[in-house]
């Protein structure tokens, strides 16, 4: 093995299998590009992104960890979101939730 070498098996890797998803149309109504990372709570993204925020609550982009989606000014694109897993508690971001996503 060479240092830093990856040994990848043949086949497909399925991301987020069995998790709830939703597809939304998202438009950047701002005058600057907006980039959203893979694990950002999509509900709390920049207000210049226009989409159905209620459907995005408790969701993140359904993309590989460490990647992002960029929205250029005036651009509209479809994105698939996936439900956050784990304890489903959200703190930080824009401070819109600051606690449990699900009602007790």
UniProtKB/Swiss-Prot annotation:
GO cellular component terms, semicolon-separated: urease complex
Signal sequence interval, chain numbering: none
One matching Pfam family, short form?
Urease_beta
Q: What class of enzyme is it?
A: hydrolase
Subcellular localization is given as: Cytoplasm
Q: Name one GO biological process term.
A: urea catabolic process
UniProt pathway: Nitrogen metabolism; urea degradation; CO(2) and NH(3) from urea (urease route): step 1/1
The protein's name: Urease subunit beta
Upper classification of the organism? Bacteria, Pseudomonadati, Pseudomonadota, Alphaproteobacteria, Hyphomicrobiales
């Amino acid at each position: 093995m060479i240092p830093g070498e990856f040994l990848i098996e043949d086949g497909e890797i399925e991301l987020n299998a069995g998790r709830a998803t939703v597809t939304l149309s998202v438009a950047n109504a701002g005058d600057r590009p907006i980039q959203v990372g893979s694990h950002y709570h999509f509900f709390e993204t920049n207000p210049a992104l226009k989409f159905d925020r209620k459907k995005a609550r408790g969701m993140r982009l359904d993309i590989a960890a460490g990647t992002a989606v960029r929205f250029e000014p005036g651009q509209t694109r479809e994105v698939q979101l996936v439900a956050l897993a784990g304890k489903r508690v959200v703190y930080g971001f824009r401070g819109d939730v600051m606690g449990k996503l699900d009602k007790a």
